[in-house]
Regions:
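Residue-level signal for inorganic ion chemistry
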Residues: 12, 39, 71
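Short alpha-helix plus adjacent loop in nuclease-associated cores
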Residues: 35-53
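Gly/Ser/Thr-rich active-site cleft segment
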Residues: 53-165
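Thiamine diphosphate
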Residues: 168-170
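A charged helix-plus-loop insertion that forms the helical arch/lid used to bind
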Residues: 28-41, 104-108
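N-terminal glycine/serine-rich phosphate-binding loop of ATP-dependent small-molecule kinases
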Residues: 1-32, 77-79, 126, 147-160
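N-terminal phosphate-binding loop and adjacent alpha-helix
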Residues: 1-8, 45-51, 58
Length: 170
């Protein structure tokens, strides 16, 4: 019965707590423990002021941007920075390129301009951030090996989900 249900799956979307951030290499291998959404990273106040507008979701020590600065400090500027839902999407795809807009607000993504803040675009680690896609966008087809491992059709589409709070409203 479960295999029959799995064979009917056509698309998957992940929702997750938007602030949890992890560092991984280009193959998606985590470099260490994720920094949870509730963890504040102290000592980055001046950098945050230079990178993002004050009062925005990325401007505090408890935002993902502060966690990104901490992870970059520990693991270096060549590590990928991914929120948990974006990392899981990468695991399904075998490709850690993509990020979903809502999950990246606290990292500095601007929903109105559909871009990173200008000061952030000048950082040497900008290319370590995900390419952002809107919620509901198709990111790609599940990796063949992952489909086999999970007993899913090999044409399942992986779709950008949303944050846990947005999903709760839906």
């Amino acid at each position: 019965r479960i295999s029959e249900q799995r064979s009917n799956i056509r698309a998957l979307a992940v929702d997750g707590t938007s602030g949890t951030l992890l560092a991984c290499d280009s193959t998606g291998r985590p470099q260490g423990e994720a920094l949870l959404y509730s963890e504040a990273c102290q000592g980055f106040e001046l950098q945050l002021q230079k990178l993002v507008p004050e009062g925005g979701p990325a401007s505090s020590n408890s935002g993902s941007l502060a966690r990104a600065l901490q992870l970059t400090k520990v693991y270096g500027p060549s590590t990928l920075l991914r929120h948990q839902a974006d990392w899981i999407n990468g695991w399904f795809l075998g490709d850690w390129t993509w990020g979903e807009e809502g999950n990246n607000l606290r990292l500095g993504w601007n929903l109105e301009n559909h871009s990173w803040p200008e000061a952030l675009t000048k950082q040497p680690w900008l290319n370590r951030l995900p390419i952002i896609k809107p919620s509901g966008s198709t990111l790609g087809t599940i990796a063949r090996a992952r489909a086999l491992e999970l007993g899913l059709p090999d044409d399942v589409q992986i779709v950008a989900g949303t944050t846990d709070s947005n999903a709760a409203v839906l």
